[in-house]
Amino acid sequence: MVKNLSQLKKTLKKGTCFEITGHCRPEYVGQKRKVTVANTQGFYSIVPEEPGCKVTLANNGKGSVLWWSNAPFWRFEDGICSVYCSDKQHTKEFLIMSFRIMEQEVA
């Protein structure tokens, strides 16, 4: 289970799958994603089950990007990794995305 940002950066590598449990855009909740690129600046992810999806097609096929923020913008609780647009208020109002790392790969 990921407990901090350093562990998350080591865990999210190409091929890692995760499920979105909360998002600033509610239509993305429940979506299963697969990391295509991860580096020191952030990570890109696609929806492997939907090759024509706008998330998958974004950034020339690398997928949607989430840039790493500093540690105070993150919260790690009960296997859920959450990033917020505030380093002080970790509430739904400031949520960018929450997700859990999946044990098995998605398609």
Question: Where are each of the predicted segments found?
Answer:
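Tryptophan-anchored aromatic micro-motifs
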Residues: L12-H23
